[in-house]
Amino acid sequence: MSRSALDSLHEPYFVQKLWVGDELVGRNRFEVFRQICQGRSVLHVGCVDWPITRVDDNLHVHLDPHCARLDGLDVHDEAFASLQPRLQGRLFSDWSQVQDEYDVVLVPEVLEHVPNVAEFLIEIDRVRASHVVLTVPDAYQCFKRHFDYDRDSQTFVEVVHPDHNNWYTPYTLNNTIRKYTSWVLQGIWFFNGISLLAIAQKSH
């Protein structure tokens, strides 16, 4: 890979480099997910957009007509009643209810919410599916617009969903997937102006 200005500022051990695609920059979020899920059987994890469920803007509702089969999983089942009339598939509130086989497990903007990332990835791995598509908030893309510090009042300002536990970068997302799964990571892309999108193939 090409040399970076950071190479001369840090010990080589701490300088991490990996390929990140920019083909999805500027692409509509719903359209990208539609193309990924088109004609496939999909399990959508985190399907209700908690805590603000807007049915007309809900990703799960938008994807439903385009998938061969679309089921949803979310612990916030209080929102199921508003979504179900617009859906053909099933909605699950617990991993134990997921018994079918899928082409894709879609996990958009969920990883940053979960209390135990390793256990969460194990649950995804138990689902019989060939591919996993994950998106997470990207600290690199959000740095200039989401963080500020007022020295006079010693106040740190962060624009973030109040339920988030962490941010990711291309390296830490890559490292998390490789550390806690046996999946084959097919790529990471900058996505939606604020996120990273990763596609992984399960090894079994």
Where would I find each of the regions flagged by the language model?
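Class I SAM-dependent methyltransferase core
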Residues: H44, E112
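Class I SAM-dependent methyltransferase SAM/SAH-binding core
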Residues: V48-D94
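A short beta-strand submotif of the Rossmann-like class I SAM-dependent methyltransferase core
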Residues: V104-V110
